[in-house]
Design a protein with these regions (language model features):
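Alpha-helical/coil-rich non-catalytic "connector" segments in signaling and regulatory proteins
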Residues: 1-114
Length: 116
C-alpha cells in the first residue's frame, strides 16, 4: 500500500503543519524525505520525495515560482517550509505557484527539523 501526502500529515509532528496550497495534490505518493537548503535543490531530489526546508536558499532565488516549477518537475510530492530564522512567512509567489501546480505546500510551526 502506498503512503500518501494525506497520510503523513496525520502523523505528529507533521499534523501540526498548515496547508497553504495544493490541496488537490494530497493524493501524491510519498517515497522518502529530503532536507535541503541549496538554490539548485532539484538536482538532489527524487520522485516521490517530500522536501523540508527552512528557506535559507530562497534568499538567493529571484523567481520562487520557477523554483516551485523545477521541484515539481523533479517529482517532489510535497514541500514543507519552516518559517522563522530565514523567512517570516512563506512567500506568496510560492503559494500561488504551488496552487497552480497542485503541489501541496505546508508551513511548519516552530519545531526543529530533527523531530521529523
Amino acid at each position: 500500500m502506498d503512503l500518501l501526502v494525506q497520510d503523513i500529515i496525520k502523523l505528529y509532528p507533521l499534523s501540526r503543519a498548515r496547508l497553504l496550497a495544493g490541496k488537490s495534490g494530497l493524493m501524491r505518493t510519498v517515497a522518502s524525505a529530503n532536507i535541503q537548503e541549496v538554490p539548485n535543490v532539484e538536482r538532489w531530489l527524487r520522485r516521490g520525495e517530500v522536501l523540508f526546508t527552512a528557506g535559507y536558499a530562497f534568499r538567493e532565488l529571484e523567481d520562487l515560482g520557477a523554483f516551485m516549477e523545477r521541484i515539481e518537475r523533479a517529482g517532489v510530492s510535497a514541500v514543507f517550509v519552516k518559517p522563522g530564522q530565514y523567512l517570516q512567512a512563506v512567500p506568496r509567489e510560492m503559494i500561488d505557484a504551488a496552487e497552480r501546480l497542485k503541489l501541496p505546500l505546508f508551513s511548519l510551526p516552530e519545531l526543529s527539523l530533527i523531530h521529523i
